[in-house]
UniProtKB/Swiss-Prot annotation:
Keywords: Glutamine amidotransferase, Hydrolase, Lyase, Pyridoxal phosphate
Involved pathway(s): Cofactor biosynthesis; pyridoxal 5'-phosphate biosynthesis
Catalytically driven reaction(s): aldehydo-D-ribose 5-phosphate + D-glyceraldehyde 3-phosphate + L-glutamine = pyridoxal 5'-phosphate + L-glutamate + phosphate + 3 H2O + H(+); L-glutamine + H2O = L-glutamate + NH4(+)
EC number(s) given by UniProt: 4.3.3.6, 3.5.1.2
NCBIfam families: PLP_synth_Pdx2
Gene it is expressed from: pdxT
UniProt record similarity statement: Belongs to the glutaminase PdxT/SNO family.
Name this protein carries in UniProt: Pyridoxal 5'-phosphate synthase subunit PdxT
Length: 198
């Protein structure tokens, strides 16, 4: 199993390390900084970061186009925080103002700074669909999903905002599972991979 982590900007190292732990030696994790690597992977993680910069670089490097193509073929893609924004079909005024070209893969509308700025970062226990125990979620300038289509399964909510969801092979979380020692969200994503092999 080969998991690619988009490494053009953002919270990359933590994701790589957490994914390696989650794989337990039964696969490899590669970082992606340019086009040509996405098609060689079995699944992709789009980490947090500054969404405007991440979006611009992904399109410029040809990575966005590759992700869209592979996602439409069924490759599992997981977007955390800024990655959630990129996978969305619709954004709020903030997204429109910055002229972000979203990937348009998930039938969701996103509020880019739903939980405020960096100083408003916080942790909260979340009830996540399919998890026996609450998941301690770390939110950093987090976005949120304000509406979702019928094909989108809501996995978690916080303050009436959707903060984790899945649409077939696409998974998003507004929080950062890689910043905790809890690997359940990583395992959840990895369970999506065997059904689709590159």
């Amino acid at each position: 199993m080969r998991i690619g982590v988009i490494a053009i900007q953002g919270n990359v190292e933590e994701h790589v390390e957490a994914m390696k732990r989650a794989l337990g030696g039964k696969g490899e994790v590669v970082t992606i900084k340019h086009s040509g690597i996405v098609p060689t992977c079995d699944a992709i993680v789009i980490p947090g970061g500054e969404s405007t910069t991440l979006c611009r670089l992904a399109w410029r490097e040809g990575i966005a186009q590759e992700i869209i193509e592979k996602a439409r073929q069924g490759m599992p893609i997981w977007g955390t925080c800024a990655g959630l924004i990129l996978l969305a079909s619709r954004g709020d005024e903030e997204v429109t103002k910055t002229k972000q070209q979203l990937f348009g893969l998930m039938d969701i509308t996103v509020n880019r700074n739903a939980f405020g700025r960096q100083i408003d970062s916080f942790e909260a226990p979340l009830a996540i669909a399919g998890f026996d125990e609450p998941f301690n979620a770390v939110f950093i300038r987090a976005p949120a999903i304000v509406s979702a289509g019928q094909n989108v399964k809501v996995l978690a909510k916080y303050d009436d905002f959707i903060v984790a969801a899945r649409q077939q092979n696409l998974l998003v979380s507004a929080f950062h599972p890689e910043l905790t020692d809890d690997l359940r969200f990583h395992w959840y994503f990895l369970e999506m991979v065997p059904g689709w092999k590159n």
